[in-house]
Amino acid sequence: MPWIGKKGSVTFEESTNNANIVINYYRSVGFPDTTIAGIMGNMYAESGINPNREETGGTGYGLVQWTPVSVLQNACSVLGLSPYTSGDVQLQVIPQEVLNHANIAQWYTSEAFISRFYNSGATPDMVGITG
């Protein structure tokens, strides 16, 4: 099933549909389930796994609430991806940011945010991905 995106909230069923797209995409590019679980946890907290979610009262946008939306737009421009509103495009941007390819990373320069979790040692059964 294709992405389901809305400016507001998506239902649990719609979020589950989108979660399966995320799982299938990141598995297809070789991400371990533990990494996928971490990414999806962030997406769920930020947008409900909704690629078109607009931040209420703010300027965040998309699966991981890029703030302001121009950060996502600029990353897409640098990477030659479009449209920025596409869930598939946003999935491609995230690893590029994490690896800081093309200097598009958007977060504080501290290892405290990702290094603790990058090689956590968690196994797939510990994170419960079944998609």
Predicted features by range, described:
Residues G8, F12-S77, Q92-Q96:
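Secreted/periplasmic proteins that engage bacterial cell-wall peptidoglycan
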Residues M40-G41, T56-G131:
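Catalytic and binding regions of secreted/periplasmic enzymes and modules that target cell-wall glycans
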Residues M1-G8:
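Short, intrinsically disordered N-terminal pre-domain segments
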